[in-house]
Amino acid sequence: MKKGISVILAVLLAVSCLTGLSGCGSSKKTTLYVYNWGQYISEGDDGSLDVIAAFEEAYPNIRVQYSTYDSNEIMYSKLSNGGITVDVIIPSDYMIGRMVQEGMLEELNFSNIPNYQYIDDSFKNTSYDPENKYSVPYTWGTVGIIYNTKYVDPADVTGWELLWNEKYAGKILMFDNSRDAFGIAEYLLGYDVNTTDEAELQACSAKLAEQKPVVQQYVMDQIFDAMENEEAWIAPYYAGDYLTMVEENPDLAFYRPTAQGYNMFIDAMCIPTCCQEKEAAEAFINFLCSPEISSANMEFLGYSVPSTAAKELMDPEVAGSEVAYPDADTLTTGTSFNFLPEETSRYMESLFMEVRNG
């Protein structure tokens, strides 16, 4: 894919000049505020495509102001508190459902997003956006356990209980967000990962408190340095990010606890109601849906692409990765997080903070 970057840009520049927002014949200057997960877009490292630079080249009168967050909850809190301008966000499925219900997302004008045609039908009509009004899938993936084969006995890698194993005390990392952390406890205890039962949530909290003595630290993006540099040996995290880490440390392996269950997610591009530049935001979303851009972006990130047209352009080794694209039988053992009632979300968050900070 790297050798085709100049061709990609030439094609996209030609196409963009046919659109009203390309800037090819316009003098209006626009700043587009994009708020995304950390390490979640190809930035031109190691000869990869710099997606933001490519967009700004295709749309010379749009300047992207790019900032990042570590969790859905941080993003939600920042937007719900108000007082900021954000034009594009990329929340996860359950958070999209919450934001739709609370009136925090704009309906999209799909006439400005013709590349939506390349999104596979299996990623449309979802539970969180059943009428396809508010979101365009960006990536999908699964959660599993990353472990270092130099230090972890494979006989111990049998399920989520590995994250509680005292043999590896001080070398275990844990998610620093309530939904993912509670999800693991729910899988381990055999509960529905979308439970609203307070007794079950309390049991999960107790299980996480039981784990705390063996946890080195609660992390999100900090996991990269910790696992790559062998400061930690075991951590739950996203399959796409594992594929980035293993390039830096080939002793890392990935395990999905299929017998107990694991989270399968979709992250999608949305426009919040605080947006000031909706057409530019839709142009950005459309740009990222281009098979050429999407394939180059996801090939670098390691995340799974929700577009067969894009996948067909990727390096066959990447597109054939079982970690990124598990088989149908494996996928049947994964479950998705649904939007929880506000009182449940707040209760879960308070329980998690008690564990984390207690």
Q: Where are the model-predicted features located?
A:
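Short beta-strand->loop
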Residues: 106-117, 135, 251-263, 272-275
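Mature extracytoplasmic/periplasmic domains
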Residues: 267, 272-332
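Ligand-binding pocket segment of bilobal, Venus flytrap-like solute-binding proteins
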Residues: 173-177, 181, 185, 193-256
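Conserved C-terminal helix/tail region of periplasmic/extracytoplasmic solute-binding proteins
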Residues: 329-358
